[in-house]
Amino acid sequence: MKIGIFFESSPREGGAFHTNLNIVNIFNEYNKNILDITYIVKSTEVEKILKSKGCKCVFFKSTIIFRIQSILQKSFLLNSLLKKFKIKNNFENFLLNQKFDIIYFNSPTIFSTFLEEIPFVMNIYEMQHRTDNYFPEYRKSGHSLDARDEIILNAVKKS
């Protein structure tokens, strides 16, 4: 079984990065070539860190076409048209070309909303983001609680 683990956090994110790095360490310790695990990364910095730990990595580059598709997918009408004409998102095409059987998202991410065919699993660490937003990342003006709700709702339906 070929498992893709989406590693989105960066060393500058502190706790999230180290939590994800601990997941890598656990897989390295307990997976003695039982499963074919590949890490999907968006950062060359993270790719270097994971490769130094002996991990197999593939780099997903966010192109302008991917960004346009991401914007179009937010519209129900445009997303329906993309599905009708069987136009897949570049992220899912990338994963299909890698022949992954399942994707593991180690935290809620917008990338999970792009998957239609490939099954996935997602960690959701806490759900009190609406009532107790004491984490600094939730208080920042750029953080959207609605986007987080949408990601979690999508994951509940599809994963």
Where are these regions (language model features)?
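Carbohydrate transferase catalytic cores enriched for Leloir-type hexosyltransferases
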Residues: 1-159
